Regions:
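UBC/E2-like fold recognition across ubiquitin and ubiquitin-like conjugation systems
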Residues: 1-183
């Protein structure tokens, strides 16, 4: 089996160059699960001093850069916060959201808070269910069904999400602004 980085070494070099230019502290490695997937790992503090320091993994799907469905949000680069874990944050804020929206789960889902935080999705990862940042809204997606976004652009988008998430958790912006998605 040939992985995307073996069959398209030029794309691999471009991915590495983009990450080294914009996120030089991130390191690339291969998943130890036998899947052949590559990932980047590093920390960012997008809100600046006093903000949360996020330990992040950017995981390439083996189909990179091909996107096979318009529902494949985020393209082929998945953003997994290791610390803080989104699942932990979501579980902490969900009771507040439930109270705010009078325990109306249909309304909570319509408002975009079905998992407790806006613009996240859950997926099995190893032995755990983890929450990932949805790293691209289809209307802002930099790519198409032929070419996916790069890790650098996915992480840039995720950093904007992290800033707004922190502001929302601190009560600095409203639910509506947090859900708008124009980050």
């Amino acid at each position: 089996m040939y992985y995307w980085y073996q069959s398209d070494p030029d794309l691999y070099k471009l991915e590495v160059a983009a990450m080294m230019k914009f996120f030089p502290s991130f390191k690339i490695d291969q998943m130890k699960d036998g899947s052949g997937r590559l990932f980047w790992r590093g920390t960012v503090q997008p809100a600046g001093p006093g903000g949360i320091e996020w330990d992040i993994m950017l995981i390439y799907k083996n189909t990179h850069p091909k996107v096979y469905s318009e529902n494949e949000y985020g393209g082929t680069v998945q953003i997994l916060p290791i610390s803080p874990r989104l699942k932990d944050i979501a579980e902490q804020v969900m009771p507040i959201i439930e109270e705010t929206y009078n325990y109306d789960y249909d309304l909570i889902c319509k408002k975009g808070f079905g998992l407790g935080l806006p613009h996240i999705y859950r997926q099995e990862f190893g032995r755990n269910e983890e929450y990932f940042i949805c790293s691209a809204d289809p209307k802002y997606f930099k790519g198409n069904f032929e070419n996916s976004t790069t890790a650098a652009s996915a992480l840039s988008w995720a950093c904007k999400w992290m800033i707004l998430c922190e502001m929302w958790l601190n009560g600095e912006i409203s639910d509506d602004v947090a859900l708008e998605g124009n980050y």
